[in-house]
Amino acid sequence: MRLLILILLSVLVLFQHDFWFGSNGFLDYRQNAEKIKENQAENEKLSQRNQRINAEIQGLTKGFEAIEERARMQHGLVKENEVFYHIVKESK
């Protein structure tokens, strides 16, 4: 009877060891869950960035005003017979 109890306890210990420390065990599960959370956060950032870029693309393809604004701001372009004033804030 003692031998049977000893064998059952050793089998239980082996199963517990595999559960906690084995491949695909509890510790691996926790690490993978953390990686999933990090990846989901990164995906959310990228999704928001994609939405901003998509909105910018839609603005550029649909409206002339967006193209004109971009040309003025990024390239300093002005219309014919137009005076452009660039006001620079004084640094302290």
Swiss-Prot record:
As for membrane topology, the entry says: Single-pass type II membrane protein
Q: Which residues lie on this side of the membrane: Cytoplasmic?
A: 1-3
GO terms for cellular component:
cell division site; cell septum; plasma membrane
Q: Which keywords accompany this UniProt record?
A: Cell cycle, Cell division, Cell inner membrane, Cell membrane, Coiled coil, Membrane, Transmembrane, Transmembrane helix
Key word RNA-binding present: no
Q: Which domain of life is it from?
A: Bacteria
What sections of the sequence does the record tag as coiled-coil?
28-63
**Carries keyword Disulfide bond?**
no
Tell me, what is an example of a GO biological process annotation in this record? FtsZ-dependent cytokinesis
| UniProt subcellular location | Cell inner membrane
- Where are the Periplasmic topological domains? 22-92
User: Where, by residue number, does the polypeptide cross the bilayer?
Assistant: 4-21
Family, as annotated: Belongs to the FtsB family.
The task this protein performs is described as: Essential cell division protein. May link together the upstream cell division proteins, which are predominantly cytoplasmic, with the downstream cell division proteins, which are predominantly periplasmic.
How it assembles, according to the record, is: Part of a complex composed of FtsB, FtsL and FtsQ.
- State the PANTHER family in the record: CELL DIVISION PROTEIN FTSB (PTHR37485:SF1)
Q: What is this protein called?
A: Cell division protein FtsB
Gene name in the database record: ftsB
